[in-house]
Amino acid sequence: MNRVNDMSPVEGDLGLQLSSEADKKFDAYMKRHGLFEPGNLSNNDKERNLEDQFNSMKLSPVASSKENYPDNHMHSKHISKLPIASPIPRGLDRSGELSYKDNNHWSDRSSTGSPRWENGSMNLSVEEMEKVVQPKVKRMATICQMFFLDHYFEQLHYLYTRKQRARLFEEQLLKEPDSRRDELVKRYNGRERVYLRKRRTRISHGDFQTITQVGQGGYGSVWLARKRDTKEIVALKIMNKSVLHKMDEIRHVLTERDILTTANSEWLVRLLYAFQDTSNIYLAMEFVPGGDFRTLLSNSGVLRDHHAKFYATEMFLAIDALHQLGYIHRDLKPENFLVGASGHIKLTDFGLSSGIISKKKIESMKIRLQEVNNVVVPERSMRERRQVFRTLLSQDPVYAHSVVGSPDYMAPEVLRGENYNHSVDYWSLGCIMYECLSGFPPFSGSNVNETWSNLKNWRKCFQRPHYDDPRDLEFNWRDDAWDFVCHCITDPKDRFCSLKQVMQHPYFSKIDWKNVRTAYRPPFVPDLNSEIDAGYFDDFTNENDMSKYKEVHEKQAAIANMVNTFNKPKRNAFIGFTFRHQKNSHPTSSSSALSSPLSAPSFGTLL
């Protein structure tokens, strides 16, 4: 959880942090390709293991002559001693230690105005240091780092698997009659040529067969699609580059992409592919077929206490998985949680998780808070507030899907543009849990202005639902449930800020946190006809469902009319966006060497 603090400007050793990220990537590759189990080997063991695996390839070392190195002490055959790109250049090995012990192996070029190397690091000016700690520079440096790691490991992996295929083919070929050998060799060579061509082919929109639309947002659309060669079912998000540039959303999209590529949790939606063309960018994510939690909540009204507790448990685990990656969501809503085929939830939509809100957004929220100073909010009972919210949902389908959006679940310090930490996500989850048990959000009003006013005066508005009417007695809260929500919806200094605090609260005393996905059957399990069943999403051929997106389409039309009057995004605006998820492709039998080509391995982050 401490990694959440990384969202602030970096004050420590940036080179060491980037080297740590490279180390994770390095270990992931080795484990994925079956070369070693990262946790069980030391760095020296890893180096020896790699040498054993790749020595038989008889690779010629690149730039191996001594004159290519500033000092003879730098020459090393170990892969883990290769220099890693970093905004603060250092000779770091995989463990983060200095690989080159000679403190004077770099020439002093300070007289020319260029940076000077000393004690293994570069002395930078104040202006250069300011650039180094910028989030954009950090990201670009990491992209460069990952690119070279991906490139060379994929090259080594290709050579290794090609040799394995050739060996298996030769073994099987000896068992075949002479009359068939020429034909089999020809087929083998043909497969290898196809394999090489496939490695050079860029992924494109045409590689996917769209099935039906399942979502629509202010900046793009989401489609259920099938990848033509692998038959993978994905949710393909398509966003226009010019629109993103005009609305200053490029950083948010890149943040979402970075989170998805980093995430390796059962609680977070997985990214399978990310690619782009001249007009659009594409995110192909795993398809979660059960719809979003908003739909489930709207159809259910009020959840029973043990059902609400189950979903709250999974939501806290999901947001903790995001926090452990070093990100804050800040804008959690029921729509951000999707229900999987098994009934368990996954967190998605990380576009605003960068930890940086644009000045325009902050200013607009401050203005909204000021505008509601004179708004007269009528006193309403809990029963009236629940009825108002349910009426709005039934009569105005746009209400819960507004592009502008009301701040029902957003912490006050975020709205005011003040400093905040990851506890703002616990505020949001407290609001969602309140809605699960009450049937309406704690600060909802009959209109958006009333909601803003309620949030500004949240201490007065936040009340425990209590019902005396016999028809509503079942909606009364348990004391431990109310106490828990009060620890989420409160001032930052008193608010829960860690999963450990949540787990230790009496309300969750009987929850088996380590085995939630196996120990409990979800209250709702989607009834699916096939892997491409999109029945739990809006039908975009239905006029009633499309009415929810009237405001979305109006905003898109307004943006489209404005886009041409502004400069287009720079060509490098989306650099480092491309991604393919990893899949093993080791040969398993000698017969496969003759009968079928191996599927091409997928690539990691590519420029």
Curated annotation (Swiss-Prot):
**Pfam families hit by this protein:** Pkinase, Pkinase_C
Question: How does this polypeptide assemble, per the annotation?
Answer: Interacts with mob1 and cdc11.
SUPFAM superfamilies in UniProt: Protein kinase-like (PK-like)
Keyword terms: ATP-binding, Cell cycle, Cell division, Cytoplasm, Cytoskeleton, Kinase, Mitosis, Nucleotide-binding, Phosphoprotein, Septation, Serine/threonine-protein kinase, Transferase
Report the InterPro entries cross-referenced here.
AGC-kinase_C, Kinase-like_dom_sf, Pkinase_C, Prot_kinase_dom, Protein_kinase_ATP_BS, Ser/Thr_kinase_AS, Ser_Thr_kinase_AGC
Sequence ranges of Polar residues compositional bias: 109-118
Question: Could you identify this protein by its name?
Answer: Serine/threonine-protein kinase sid2
Reaction catalyzed? L-seryl-[protein] + ATP = O-phospho-L-seryl-[protein] + ADP + H(+); L-threonyl-[protein] + ATP = O-phospho-L-threonyl-[protein] + ADP + H(+)
The enzyme's first-digit EC class, named in words, is transferase
Catalytic activity, EC: 2.7.11.1
Residue ranges of the Protein kinase domain? 208-508
Q: Where is the composition biased (Basic and acidic residues)?
A: 93-108
Gene Ontology molecular functions: ATP binding; protein serine kinase activity; protein serine/threonine kinase activity
Q: Which organism is it from?
A: Schizosaccharomyces pombe (strain 972 / ATCC 24843) (Fission yeast)
